[in-house]
Structures are given as structure tokens and as C-alpha cells.
Amino acid sequence: MKRIALFGGTGKTGKEFLQKALENEYHIKVLARSPEKVDTQSPHLEVIKGDVLNPAEVNATVTGTDIAVSLFGHVKGSPKWLQSDGTSNILSAMLDHGVEKIISLSGGGLPFHKDEPKFADKAIRLIMKVAVPKVLNDAIRHAEILKDSDRKWVIVRGPRLTEEPEKGNYRVGWVGVNASTSIGRADLADFILKQVEEDT
């Protein structure tokens, strides 16, 4: 069973992923600025107090693992390049410890060349550019950092997130083509875990 280095495990989606991964008997090392927010207990869980912007603490989290899962994101007061700099730290630690693959969660506003955004999609992206340019620019930059790395990577772009119970069925695709416009966090966590299980 793969050992997971988890970043962002105390957020709403992170908690869903952590619980599901532990239920599937994965061993997890989670980095948390506030370890008390990790309200799950398991012999397969190790919690490390630290910050994704601290290279040494990221390195300690990645050591002894097989794959990195990055679910952290901006909150009020976050540094401008939180996702980019945190991702760079994770990639550096992965290189040090021979970890080959990272899965990174981002928002549906992150553009991709296979997207065919409809009017509503374009409107949402325009709103993001105006309302939260820091978040969108950081997401774009973090994607470029992943693309320029020599690690295997998967970027999961989540649409509007809901708190509905897990359904077990959801659509995956490109914006405006065949992707869902919303998804429950539990189903999103399920999809992310499936990417952990994939070998490519």
C-alpha cells in the first residue's frame, strides 16, 4: 500500500480525503500548521506540525512516503504565491527522496488548452480575474511549476464544491465539454484517491 505525504489535510476537502484514505488502509503523513485540527486518529496516521512554506518541514513530511497529495489553498492573509512556493518545496523534497508523483488540487478557473468554456464558464473566470486575481495567478504559476518539473503530476480542478453526501458517480472532463459544474467534497476526495491508485 502506498504511503502518502498529505498537504492541506485540515481543510474541508482535505479532511474528506484523509478519512477516505485511512478507511482504505493507506499510511499517511500529514503536515499541519495546527495539528489539533486533524481530528482523525489512526495507527496509520502521522501528524507533523509545520508549514508548507518551510522546506525542512515539507522534507520531513515527504521522507518515507511514495506519493504526495497537495490539497492546500489560499485563506485570508495567505502569501501571494502560497500554492506556487509550497508546490516548489514539495517537488524539491520529492526529488530528494525519490518520490515520483504528485497530485495537486486547484480550482475550475485554472485554464487548460482542451477546455471549451461556455458563456457561464467565461463569466466565472472573468469574475475570478477581477475578484481574486492573486488566487488565479498563483494557480496558473503552480501549474507551470509542475509542468516544468521532472516528476509525474496530476492537477485536479475542482468545480463548485458542495457538502452533499458521497454519490459515487460524477463526471470528469474538460471545462465546457463534459465536466460537472459542481461536485460534493466526498466525491472529489474519492476521485483524488483514485489518482493515487493509478500508476501513471
How would you name each of these model-derived features?
Residues 87, 138, 156, 180-193:
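Substrate-positioning beta->alpha
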Residues 143-164:
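Conserved beta-loop-beta element that borders a ligand/cofactor-binding pocket
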Residues 165-168, 195-200:
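Glycine/proline-rich active-site loop of Rossmann-fold NAD(P)-dependent oxidoreductases
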Residues 75-104, 134, 141:
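NAD(P)-cofactor binding segment of oxidoreductase domains
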Residues 62, 66-69, 103:
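N-terminal Rossmann-like NAD(P) cofactor-binding module of classical short-chain dehydrogenase/reductase
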Residues 31-36, 51-52:
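N-terminal Rossmann-fold cofactor-binding loop
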Residues 4-24:
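N-terminal Rossmann NAD(P)H-binding glycine-rich loop of SDR-like oxidoreductase domains
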Residues 43-65:
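Conserved Rossmann-fold cofactor-binding substructure of NAD(P)-dependent oxidoreductases
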